[in-house]
Regions:
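N-terminal helix-rich module
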Residues: 2-6, 28, 32-58, 62, ...
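Glycine-centered recognition micro-motifs in short, flexible terminal segments and loops
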Residues: 3-27
Length: 182
């Protein structure tokens, strides 16, 4: 019986001082790791938005060929069901078909239209879309013959972050409709 009580006497847990030392070390490590993690999360959001944009441009080009019609990628309106007369691409974008040659509006008669609706981008990102003359665009038009249409030139989409040290990524849509990421 005496042996059992000695064994129980030796079993102990952490002392309060040991616990406080472990908590202090964990706090120091967290303080060092959090800023690096925030940068990683921001870079991931930017790359994710870029991949989504390139994917939507390629899908718009493919849909134009598949449907043998004109397809628009344009700034999303507030309702999310068509194009806005704005160059603020941060509000999101839609991909839809249009029937008119120079139209910047979705064809509401076809269904489903728009067939891609993207929500607003993260506020830490900026997206600008310009033509060859650096004029801001609200619409990119892709035609069934793999071109952007009469009088269209290449469009350049630039996605960058608002934080210091952010890298700007550029996507070019050639007048032939080819999408390339730089």
């Amino acid at each position: 019986m005496k042996f059992r009580s000695l064994a129980l006497a030796r079993i102990r847990g952490f002392t309060l001082i040991e616990l406080l030392v472990v908590i202090a070390i964990a706090a120091i490590l967290a303080t060092v790791a959090v800023p690096a993690l925030q940068g990683t999360v921001r870079d991931f959001r930017q790359r994710s938005a870029l991949s989504l944009l390139v994917s939507d441009l390629n899908q718009a080009r493919g849909e134009a060929i598949k449907r043998n019609s004109r397809v628009l990628l344009c700034v999303r309106n507030a309702a999310g069901n068509g194009c806005a007369a704005s160059t603020n691409w941060l509000s999101g974008w839609v991909v839809c078909t249009t029937d008119a040659v120079t139209s910047t509006a979705c064809d509401t008669a076809s269904s489903p239209n728009p067939f891609i609706v993207r929500p607003a981008l993260d506020t830490s990102l900026t997206l600008t879309v310009t033509d060859a003359a650096s004029v801001a665009l609200s619409t990119i038009r892709l035609n069934a013959n793999s071109s952007q249409g009469a009088g269209s030139s290449a469009a350049t989409l630039t996605l960058s972050g608002t934080w210091s040290g952010a890298t700007a990524h550029t996507v070019t849509v050639a007048s032939t409709g080819n999408v390339s990421k730089h």
